[in-house]
Amino acid sequence: MASKESKPSRTTWRDMEPPLRETWNQVLQELVKRQQQEEEEQQGLVSGKKKSWVSIDLLGTEGKDIKKVNIWEPCEKWFAQVVWGVLWVLQIVLWGCLMWEVRKGNQCQAEEVIALVSDPGGFQRVQHVETVPVTCVTKNFTQWGCQPEGAYPDPELEYRNISREILEEVYKQDWPWNTYHWPLWQMENMRQWMKENEKEYKERTNKTKEDIDDLVAGRIRGRFCVPYPYALLRCEEWCWYPESINQETGHAEKIKINCTKAKAVSCTEKMPLAAVQRVYWEKEDEESMKFLNIKACNISLRCQDEGKSPGGCVQGYPIPKGAEIIPEAMKYLRGKKSRYGGIKDKNGELKLPLSVRVWVRMANLSGWVNGTPPYWSARINGSTGINGTRWYGVGTLHHLGYNISSNPEGGICNFTGELWIGGDRFPYYYKPSWNCSQNWTGHPVWHVFRYLDMTEHMTSRCIQRPKRHNITVGNGTITGNCSVTNWDGCNCTRSGNHLYNSTSGGLLVIICRQNSTITGIMGTNTNWTTMWNIYQNCSRCNNSSLDRTGSGTLGTVNNLKCSLPHRNESNKWTCKSQRDSYIAGRDFWGKVKAKYSCESNLGGLDSMMHQQMLLQRYQVIRVRAYTYGVVEMPQSYMEERGENRRSRRNLQRKKRGIGLVIVLAIMAIIAAAGAGLGVANAVQQSYTRTAVQSLANATAAQQEVLEASYAMVQHIAKGIRILEARVARVEALVDMMVYQELDCWHYQHYCVTSTRSEVANYVNWTRFKDNCTWQQWEEEIEQHEGNLSLLLREAALQVHIAQRDARRIPDAWKAIQEAFNWSSWFSWLKYIPWIIMGIVGLMCFRILMCVISMCLQAYKQVKQIRYTQVTVVIEAPVELEEKQKRNGDGTNGCASLEHERRTSHRSFIQIWRATWWAWKTSPWRHNWRTMPYITLLPILVIWQWMEENGWNGENQHKKKKERVDCQDREQMPTLENDYVEL
């Protein structure tokens, strides 16, 4: 009874019931009803006062003309019409600009901006992806240890677009490769599961069929999801372009990926969670695999010209050089040899970073014949190479424990008795539910290939590397000027491997086929002189040359022991042509054993590598969620970056007191205008904040209810599983006792039997040891029920409080309207246009006065330029013989002479030249703001000419006499900045 009294009641009162969801028609009817009530009221809340708020006429029922104050009454009618027209034109221009911006496809839409953190893109790029927690989401979550579907949003329905500008600013047109640990963890679980049950699998027969077949075959599909504060950027459009072209060899050091369109999601696409090595994948993965066939960007590349490079550019995903497929932290997953086809290091393993760029794409098998590439029957002596490519995996392939033919229509299927996971093999027998001998046409296949010379940006054709004794001097067969970066500058007239001395000083090997087609160029910075000195130092090569002899298609040198030099295994120079001595584009002087420049593989990938490739279209980012309050905008948007966005700093003049008075007056007007709305806004914010907080509390309470319900459901499920286990136990015991297969007794929950051991091991008695009793389970259910009832009541109360607070918001406005006389408070608002017009007029008058003041100041400064007219008296030479002169004695060596001061008036052209020179040397000429003052120069010239020559040009200067002695002439100061007239 005590438990029943303490048990909370499940009944709720009527106000706790959540309101039904209103439809749009109900909302519209309520608005119309309120409008009609407002129309019936002839007066406001205060008697005798008009309503001060604005009502919206939705249905057009308000037809009465309300007398309004015309703010343009004092103005002239034409002035009002002009202003009205200008406003309309401005509005049309603004709308046109808005529509033009919206129609631009590469602009950032409003819903595409993520302003979450203080960085340009609204997110932070996560480089160490191994530190990011991840979980899987699948349908059979209880069986495979994943989260249920719906725990994370569907990426196809809920996503956020990222603009192209943000992608370029964050990733710098470089979508990097990431070695995700999530597929490695799945691979580790599969390996651990196989090792723990390896002994049991060896004893199985062909009658064994388990649900684990779906996991092995990759039919358990799910998504990888990252929790908050992480997210995934899913690329929707991308292309590749070369970077860091080696000027010596011509190969591209890097192939970068430029993603131009991406979405922010929480989960990846669906993919098989775990599987073993296979060849043909499910058709559900075709679109995802096809997306990795990345095309070249629309830039000027030689491979894009079909005439120069048949077949176009390479398509696929370039795994960069230096990538680690299995990092050092998980090196125990590496096998002795690579099981990933062409994805291998220089030693054929995965212990070192990749030394050559590896391309992975979905294979196009439309041109194949019987599971073999085109022209496969034309290969020489049954080799695996054709058209410069060595093929691996053509013939029989390993697919889910079976050897099947590479021909999808062949239907060949042989069981091997083992599964391949990474670099290890595990014996395992199972009877698959799928038909192994079916027609696999239409199922996607991975194609792994490597361009060893890495010149994908020049051509997609693979060539067979030339032997050194087949490299000869061209002798006129090569014309033009070309290099390793410019293959189109030369022309060839004969097939062969021509040694060419380029104009840049290095050596080139131009590979010419079909008499006129250049299929490749290999180069080095070593010049001809250095090479020839090495050649002459070779034994018995003093009288030899590299001239072409023989009648073969490619030609050869005369002496095979005196071919193009190279370094042997001891790093010493030699000229002997060996059987496996080829020349490579990236190793001109080394001994290269690889005959073909390309390597291709079909299949050979397990689920780990399959997931790794599909995950390359995703990048992990770090974000933060929106919160209540003000959202902090990114700092980069607040600061103007770059020289083009920086405003020029100018020295400010002293502000007079009138400016401060005007500023204070404007601030007072603005403060008065916002005083009335400030009180109402404060009250509304207070009630709104309370309502939002109540809604948040209600949401939190409902979240607790959901968590308690989920815990209760889990507990119920646990009880059901216990019940199922016990029933299964009883059924097993009954069956065994009926058929007399078991004769045992129990002792402390353990079974002691004298029958066959395999029968006793079939019943795992220890799994039922720690099961709880039904009384304990009932008590826990009762506790869950009581907790859930309390939480439901608390949630209902919080919802009721939130609804009450939300209904109080309009009541606050009515209370304020009843308390204050709003109509009289805002009666002065009708004079605001006049005040604004007055302020604008004062500002315009002030600007005009400033312009006039500047013009007057400039006029005075230019007008003050004067030219001093001086008379230079040339003294007569001194008579040393003391001869007596006619006009004086000359006893002191100087004479008193009288000269007429002759002055000539300057012409208009002279005045103009002097004025123009003064303008050119003044600082006003270098400032664009003072350039308009140049229009005043003609007026100044005319004014000065009139002052000098008079209004009629008849001013006469009187002749003056001036006595100048020697002392005065010697002590005359130097004239500076004056024009001297002789």
Curated annotation (Swiss-Prot):
Where do the record's region annotations for Immunosuppression lie?
723-738
Q: How is it modified after translation?
A: Specific enzymatic cleavages in vivo yield mature proteins. Envelope glycoproteins are synthesized as an inactive precursor that is N-glycosylated and processed likely by host cell furin or by a furin-like protease in the Golgi to yield the mature SU and TM proteins. The cleavage site between SU and TM requires the minimal sequence [KR]-X-[KR]-R.
What Gene Ontology cellular component terms go with this record? Answer: host cell plasma membrane; membrane; viral envelope; virion membrane
Q: How does it assemble?
A: The mature envelope protein (Env) consists of a trimer of SU-TM heterodimers attached by noncovalent interactions or by a labile interchain disulfide bond.
List keywords of the entry alphabetically. Cleavage on pair of basic residues, Coiled coil, Disulfide bond, Glycoprotein, Host cell membrane, Host membrane, Host-virus interaction, Lipoprotein, Membrane, Palmitate, Signal, Transmembrane, Transmembrane helix, Viral attachment to host cell, Viral envelope protein, Virion, Virus entry into host cell
Q: Name one GO biological process term.
A: virion attachment to host cell
The protein's name in its UniProt record: Envelope glycoprotein gp160
Q: Glycosylation annotated at which residues?
A: 140, 161, 206, 258, 298, 364, 381, 387, 403, 414, 435, 439, 470, 475, 481, 491, 501, 515, 527, 537, 542-543, 568, 697, 764, 771, 787, 821
Give the residue spans that cross the bilayer.
832-852
- Respond yes or no to whether keyword Cell division is given for this record: no
Which ranges does the record list as Cytoplasmic topological domains? 853-982
